[in-house]
Amino acid sequence: KKLNSPNDVVVKSDGTIWFTDPLYGIMTNEEGFKSKSELGGNYVFRVNTKNQVEIVCNDFDKPNGLAFSPDENFLYIADSGASFGEKIHPERPHHIRKFKVTRNNYLEDLGVFTVINPGVPDGFSVDSIGNIYTSSWDSIQIISPLGENIGKIEIPEKVSNCCFGGSDKKTLYITASSRLYSIRLKINGI
């Protein structure tokens, strides 16, 4: 069957590929081409080392960004279900969930890790000590490995994603509505 609209991807050190596949890329022509889902839902998939595609999670409203912890024992996945165009429905999901990754690369749901306000989480990255740098509508929010909001990088427009780069991985690149921003940090990303 045809995938919906693969959104975000991460590769684990064992070669497995993990990605989110929400419906919103096919709901209108705005982000893709409007069409009917052949899968009938929103999923998180893993491509195993034999190139087989497997569903690893099927209970997200709108699965979005994802990233592993530095030791790859945990996988974080954003749910941006509260987002409807430029509107937010706060009763819908706007959080990041945390999963334990088992020895066989299956997921054990540990529940909501952190709620993102204002806006919804989209893409995010992790630094070398496990802090999450997540997009929100007005900034990059920095979340500790314990799920606490420990900082914010203000951006003058809506933020969609971020990643670490540069030769030392201490530059955080941030995509926003109309520009690409970068900021040097004292810590490196993974």
Language-model segments: which ranges?
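Residue-level marker for isolated small/hydroxyl-bearing positions within beta-strands
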Residues: T20, A78, S135, Y173-S177, ...
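Short loop/turn segments immediately following beta-strands, especially the blade-tip
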Residues: K98-Y106, L185-I190
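A short loop-to-beta-strand structural motif that recurs across blades of beta-propeller domains
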Residues: Y43-F45, H95-R97, S139-Q141, R179
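Short coil turn/linker residues within repeat-based beta-strand modules
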Residues: T49-N51, R103, L146-E148, I187
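Beta-rich, blade/repeat-based domains predominating
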Residues: K1-I17, Y24, E38-Y43, V56-F74, ...
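Blade-level signature of beta-propeller repeat domains, shared across WD40, Kelch, NHL, RCC1
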Residues: N161-I190
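Predominantly a core beta-strand signature of beta-propeller blades
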Residues: N51-I55, D109-V112, E148-I150
